[in-house]
């Protein structure tokens, strides 16, 4: 099992009790959406559901691809306003396109959907950047649907 942890400083990856911890270095502008929680005698920051989904859409390689993002979006009771805010703050048009497409596909209501659509970048983005270039272009979302 691999656990991904975000930090603003470079930290070497490590394995503890058979669990691999991979540290992702974020710029300060992308380090938001966390709540401080107590774990034993330590305080750690844990990402909100909305931040987790936004980060997954931003970097699908850290969440095992588009299928896991879809599962998370479908199974989660989320705050649509917060998700919209976080997606806008990430400033990643591809991430926004992925979330809007999946939300429409899964009948998940997004707060401020039109604001997100207005933030689509002009080029086509891969639905899943981990996969190849084969697939159908969907102009409504400016996405290459490269998932079978």
Where are the model-predicted features located?
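Short gly/ser-rich loop at a beta-strand->alpha-helix junction or flexible surface loop bordering the NTP-binding
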Residues: 1-35, 140
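Hydrophobic alpha-helical interaction segments
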Residues: 32-148
């Amino acid at each position: 099992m691999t656990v991904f942890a975000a930090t603003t400083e470079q930290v070497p990856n490590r394995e503890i009790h058979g669990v691999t911890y991979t540290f992702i270095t974020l710029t300060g502008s992308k380090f938001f959406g966390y709540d401080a929680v107590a774990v034993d005698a330590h305080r750690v920051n844990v990402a909100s559901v909305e931040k987790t989904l936004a980060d997954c859409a931003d970097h699908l390689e850290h969440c095992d691809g588009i299928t896991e993002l879809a599962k998370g979006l479908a199974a989660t009771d989320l705050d649509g306003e917060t998700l919209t805010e976080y997606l806008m703050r990430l400033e990643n048009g591809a991430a926004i396109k992925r979330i809007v497409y999946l939300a429409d596909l899964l009948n998940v209501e997004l707060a401020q959907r039109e604001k997100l659509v207005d933030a689509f970048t002009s080029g086509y983005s891969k639905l899943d950047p981990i996969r190849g270039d084969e697939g159908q272009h969907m102009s409504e979302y400016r996405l290459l649907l490269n998932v079978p």
